[in-house]
Amino acid sequence: MEENFTRQKVDTLNITIYAEQDSKPTAAQLNLQPFAEEKDNRRLNFKAKDIGLVNNPKQSDLAIVIAPEENKAANELAEKLLNNQNLRLRITTGYDNVFEKVSEIATELEKALELGLEITDFMQIYRRGITMDKVEHQLAIFTNGIAKINMDRPAVIGDGITLLQKEEATALANFFDTKKENYKLKKFVPASGAATRMFKFLHDFMSGYNPEKETINGYTNRVKDNSLQVFLLGQEKFPFYKEIATVAEKLIKCPDMENENLREDARHYSFVKTMISEEYFDYANKPKGILPFHDYDGFAATPVYEHLKEAAAYASSKGETHVHFTISENHLNGFLDAINDARAKVEAETGIKIHFNFTYQLKETDTLAVGLDNKPFREEKTKLLFRPGGHGALIENLNRLDADVVFIKNIDNVRHTKMDTITLYKKALAGILVKLQEKVFKYLEDIESGKINEAELDEIIRFAEQELSLDISPDFDKFTLENKYQYVKEQLNRPIRVCGMVKNEGEPGGGPFWVKGKRGRLSLQIVESSQIDLDNKIQSHIFSQSTHFNPVDLVCGLKDYKGNKFDLSEYVDANTGFIVQKNRMGKEVKSYELPGLWNGAMAGWVTVFVEVPLKTFNPVKTVNDLLKPAHQKPA
């Protein structure tokens, strides 16, 4: 290399291709490709080497080792290149694809250099599977910011939200039961989040309380938070009480065991410490999904158990059910233990065969962190900082499922024993989805086969407006007949989601609104408070008038009228999302969270909102929520 390429003054960037076969013709062909822009005065120079003939690989700006994964010589060479501080990529691909693969890498490398990134940056980004187009988009978002959502009005009963009487819900649930054998059903449960916030007030207690200087009562009066008192008064009602108390009793340290008040404080302190400290139960660092939530005769049930039981009740067909959890890779073993234990119990109770699988949040959905200057943040001289993309990244996990109908629900929204209402309304939402799909699919098939005349198009438009809440273009009547067909097809041929909404009782989070898009068209969206300009009096007023809340209770149709899977990435509003500022190593950094799974990630879906009873919403946001009736053993 003739000059420091990291400063973008490179004349020639040398790239060596290592493969098992003769790749010199490929290198020659690559050297004819115009990868670099002439204005940069930069050229990529490709050379080829046989893996088996290389003992001491020479330094190059980038080494690409291409061979099957099990190729020992290739793996040894890759390791040797790494030890020699050679920048290298280890690529697993067939030899027939060498030209295409290296061309792809070279194109991405050029884009990285165009963005002012260094080659070491490119390596880290490419290995994660992140494209340079995504990086460019993310950097532009940091520079330009994210526009706030423009709400037109809240969705309410009769204007965006359908009210279901119990008789209607029962009829829809029965309808779904008659149809479900024709569908691949799956339950999708985001479950990767740790329980840190669930125990936050207990962490605050452990760090802020000094047993040698004050009583617990004095601490609670000082911090003016009764959460700890509620926890301690109700501790014997928690399903984990006996197990933790048995260990905690042995660890009590009290200077005066004869003093009842001091002894009681010491007992409480030991219980909390045993529950959340790393050396004992470490509950705060475990996922919510595998913690004991409910006390049953003979065992404590985890959310995993409750979700499997729910799946057997409303997401089963032909005597089996399929459940998919998105989890943190670090907690795989804990989930496997929890699921295998729960599966045996639920199968014995219900007679339903349970199939389950996991995915992790994909590394390719991580986003690049930047400093306050909007330049990539480096933890060390060359190490970029990547952050998880938030739950919106799970649209990629959802996109990989093979299912017709998918039930989505958060891991912490479960209840003890009584599931009749939950089951009824989940099936009712699925019944609505199936009914709507049957109509949509019939219309699309008829349009494709030429069976729809212009008068019948008006019927379809009425259906789209009244039952799908679609905002049809006011210029529709001016379209040519051919354009009308195309427009209707584009409006209908999209994934459908039917979302349960509960009456707003002050819970934090998103709600249902009519939102104006770029061209002034309205659509139903689930909007988070962080997406709204609350300093704008009109928008703040609209937000305050919301009557319903999003409990994350969705039933989704993932296939089109021909039985093909939709590419869900095509329906994401990439201009939404969240910029989050955090401290890293004493420095402020910004990260971009992708559009939320049920927010911008599904912005382009056909959306139907339906009111469901508050009984179906029983989240556990803090450990004290487990003391509520929905989480206690019925009397």
Task: Report the location of each language-model feature.
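Non-Sec secretion/translocation targeting segments of pathogen effectors
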Residues: 1-3
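Structural motif
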Residues: 18-23, 65-70, 93-95, 327-330
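A short, well-structured beta->alpha microelement
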Residues: 33-58
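Short, well-ordered secondary-structure micro-motifs within conserved domains or adaptor modules
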Residues: 51-72
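Ser/Thr/Gly-rich flexible loops in soluble cytosolic domains mediating phosphotransfer, phosphorylation
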Residues: 78-113
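Low-complexity, highly charged intrinsically disordered N-terminal segments
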Residues: 111-161, 291-295, 318-327
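Domain-scale recognition of functional cores that engage charged ligands
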Residues: 154-199, 203-505, 509-526, 530-535, ...
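Conserved catalytic alpha/beta cores of large enzymes that bind or transform nucleotide phosphates
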Residues: 412, 427-466, 543-635
